[in-house]
UniProtKB/Swiss-Prot annotation:
InterPro entries: PSII_PsbT, PSII_PsbT_sf. The chain crosses the membrane at residues 3-23. It is found in: Plastid, Chloroplast thylakoid membrane. GO terms for cellular component: chloroplast thylakoid membrane; photosystem II reaction center. This is Photosystem II reaction center protein T. It comes from the Eukaryota. Keywords: Chloroplast, Membrane, Photosynthesis, Photosystem II, Plastid, Thylakoid, Transmembrane, Transmembrane helix. Pfam families: PsbT.
Amino acid sequence: MEALVYTFLLVSTLGIIFFAIFFREPPKLPDRGGK
């Protein structure tokens, strides 16, 4: 079960870092209509 806990922690950390960078520096992608 420890492997599952370590995997969950790893995914959570990566997700937090990704969202932090995403919100701090919005991606400069070409707008294809929509929002």
